Curated annotation (Swiss-Prot):
Gene3D superfamilies: Spore Coat Polysaccharide Biosynthesis Protein SpsA, Chain A. Keywords: Nucleotidyltransferase, Transferase. The lineage of its organism: Bacteria, Pseudomonadati, Pseudomonadota, Alphaproteobacteria, Acetobacterales. The keyword Transport does not apply. It comes from the Bacteria. This is UTP--glucose-1-phosphate uridylyltransferase. The keyword Transcription regulation does not apply.
Length: 284
């Protein structure tokens, strides 16, 4: 029997050094694309997929990530008194049901994937999603929701994947693929940031994952891998042959907001959001 997927882990402990000095006092995940911070794009995507519980693996100085999703009674009372109904409505998306979001500290600095192991008490024996807020995916249907649909049919692990030029394979986790129906691929192996000439394919993994709890026991045993960090790719590879494992070519466009140059790219394609908002702003 395939367990329903209701949990998500978001690794958000990074220092955001690529965005200094902006991230000296503001968490990178609170930087905005149009009218929402990166963290809200990720949470909205997960909630659209039916995910109900969230664990932020965070670090000191990032309390604002939890505060953002808390209720601000003083602010809401002020907006109500001033009859700012549109502003009140905008705040609705920032609320989570009390008791459904928690923050845990990372143990050490072994990289973002070590953070998943730090969420093991939250995960328990349940399947869980991982969303990296650096990746914003514009799609008609939630990207992680597309993976959940595949998971509900196949069980096991499901990764969001996309084709990249061979010369860029050295920057990503790359799949060694088996059966391929054009959308869903069987995963035979995983390689983290291979030399392009040795890459088994050009299918790369993006920051959206659906995993079973089996991966945790492998994360606990791993030594540091590529980049001197514990690599989730290595732990996932050890589950191949023990649980179903698939990659899914998601529908949508992914924007990498983890670097200064790349973070500007979503602003143009997401201008539809501004077009809907600007007339109301000008006329208010």
């Amino acid at each position: 029997m395939i367990k329903p997927l209701k949990k998500a882990v978001l690794p958000v402990a990074g220092l955001g050094t690529r965005f200094l000095p902006a991230t000296k006092c503001v968490p990178k995940e609170m930087l905005t694309v149009v009218d929402r911070p990166l963290i809200q794009y990720a949470i909205d995507e997960a909630r659209e997929a039916g995910i109900e519980e969230f664990c932020l693996v965070s670090s000191r100085g990032k309390d604002s990530l939890i505060d953002y999703f808390d209720i601000s009674y003083e602010l809401e009372d002020t907006l109500k008194a001033r009859k700012k109904t549109s502003a009140l409505k905008a705040l609705e998306a920032t609320r989570v049901i009390p008791g459904t979001m928690l923050s845990v500290p990372p143990a050490g600095t072994a990289g973002p994937w070590h953070a998943i192991w730090c969420a093991r008490e939250f995960i328990g024996n349940d399947p869980f999603a991982i969303l990296l807020p650096d990746d914003v995916v514009q799609s008609k249907k939630s990207c992680i929701g597309q993976l959940v649909e595949v998971y509900n049919k196949t069980g096991g692990n499901v990764l969001a994947v996309t084709e990249v030029p061979r010369e860029q394979t050295g920057s990503y986790g790359i799949l060694d693929v088996g059966k391929d129906d054009g959308k869903t691929v069987e995963v035979k192996g995983l390689v983290e940031k291979p030399d392009p000439k040795d890459a088994p394919s050009t299918l790369s993994v993006i920051g959206r994952y659906v995993l079973t709890a089996d991966v945790l026991k492998h994360l606990a045993k791993l030594e540091k891998g590529a980049g001197g960090e514990v690599q989730l790719t290595d732990a996932m590879a050890k589950t191949i042959g023990h649980v179903p494992f698939h990659g899914y070519r998601y529908e949508g466009k992914r924007f990498d907001c983890g670097s200064k140059i790349a973070s500007w790219k979503p602003r143009s394609p997401l201008r539809w959001s501004v077009r809907n908002w600007l007339p109301a702003c000008v006329n208010s």
